C-alpha cells in the first residue's frame, strides 16, 4: 500500500496488509477498494489468471484488521467463462448501492475480430447493498472490441465517465466513454489518450484537474495523464512520483486518523 498527502508524490508502507487465501490460484491482483457511507472499506481483487468464475472479497474498518476472505462467483452461470479479471468497485451514492464491474471472456459470445476467442473480453456487472446479496450478472459494456480494466468516475449527477482499456492488437491503450448513469449505456468511446501497452487505470480528482494513473508495462513505470474535461489530456509523467514495482491499484481518500493508525501500526 502507498500513501500520499497530495496525490502526486507517493510513499510505500512497505508491508503486506492482506495475503490471498481464496481462488484456484490464490493470487491477489488488480485490487479495487471503496469506503462505504458506514465507514467500512470493501476490497475486491482478481483471484486467478484463468479458471475462476468469480473474484475475491474482504472488508475492513481500519485497513489493518480484515474480515475472512470470500469468493464471489459472479460468472457461475456461464460455464465456459475463461476468466474474471480486474473487478472494480464503485459506490453509487444516489442509488445507495455498490456497483462491481469486471472483464470476462466467453468464447464464441461476440464477434471475434482480430483477437483470439480466449482473449475477446467484454465488461460485466453486478450490484449489491450488503456484499451478501448480488443482482444477476449482466453485460455492462460491449464496445465491439476486447475491453478490460474499466473504471467508473462520477463528475456530477447524470455525468459519468468510464475509463477503459482497449485490449485489442495493436491498440493495448486507454480510452474514455460517457454516460448519464453509472450503469450505462456508454457512448462516444474516445480515441486513446495513452501510448500503446498501457492498462490498469485509476482516477483521482485533485483541485482543478483529474489525474489518471496507469501501468505503462512496456516502459515498466506507473505513468499518469491529467485532464480537466476528459477530452483533452496531457502527460503527467513528470508530475508524479511512485515507488518502483507498483501497478494497477486503486486510489481512495481516507480520513487523517486512518492514515495515522496505519503509520503507527507499520512504522514505515
Residue ranges of model-derived segments:
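Carbohydrate-active catalytic/glycan-binding domains of CAZyme proteins
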Residues: 1-268
Amino acid at each position: 500500500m502507498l500513501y500520499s498527502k497530495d496525490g502526486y508524490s507517493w510513499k510505500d508502507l512497505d508491508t503486506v496488509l492482506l495475503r490471498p487465501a481464496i481462488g484456484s490460484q490464490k493470487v491477489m491482483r488488480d485490487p479495487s477498494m471503496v469506503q462505504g457511507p458506514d465507514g467500512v472499506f470493501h476490497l475486491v481483487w482478481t483471484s486467478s489468471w484463468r479458471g475462476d468464475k468469480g473474484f475475491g472479497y474482504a472488508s475492513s474498518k481500519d485497513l489493518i484488521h480484515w474480515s475472512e476472505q470470500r469468493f464471489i462467483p459472479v460468472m457461475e452461470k456461464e460455464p465456459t467463462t475463461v476468466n474474471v479479471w480486474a473487478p472494480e468497485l464503485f459506490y453509487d451514492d444516489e442509488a445507495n448501492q455498490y456497483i462491481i464491474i469486471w472483464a470476462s471472456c466467453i468464447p464464441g459470445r461476440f464477434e471475434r475480430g482480430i483477437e483470439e476467442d480466449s482473449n475477446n473480453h467484454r465488461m460485466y456487472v453486478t450490484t449489491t447493498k450488503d456484499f451478501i446479496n448480488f443482482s444477476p450478472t449482466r453485460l455492462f459494456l460491449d464496445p465491439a472490441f476486447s475491453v478490460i480494466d474499466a473504471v467508473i468516475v462520477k463528475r456530477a449527477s447524470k455525468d459519468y465517465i468510464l475509463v477503459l482499456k482497449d485490449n485489442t492488437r495493436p491498440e493495448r491503450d486507454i480510452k474514455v466513454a460517457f454516460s448519464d448513469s453509472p450503469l450505462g449505456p456508454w457512448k462516444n468511446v474516445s480515441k486513446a489518450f495513452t501510448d500503446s501497452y498501457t492498462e490498469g487505470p485509476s482516477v483521482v480528482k485533485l483541485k482543478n484537474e483529474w489525474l489518471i494513473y496507469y501501468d505503462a508495462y512496456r516502459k515498466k513505470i506507473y505513468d499518469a495523464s491529467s485532464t480537466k474535461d476528459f477530452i483533452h489530456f496531457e502527460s503527467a509523467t513528470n508530475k508524479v512520483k511512485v515507488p518502483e514495482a507498483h501497478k494497477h491499484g486503486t486510489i481512495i481518500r481516507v480520513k487523517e486518523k486512518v492514515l495515522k493508525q496505519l503509520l503507527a501500526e507499520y512504522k514505515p
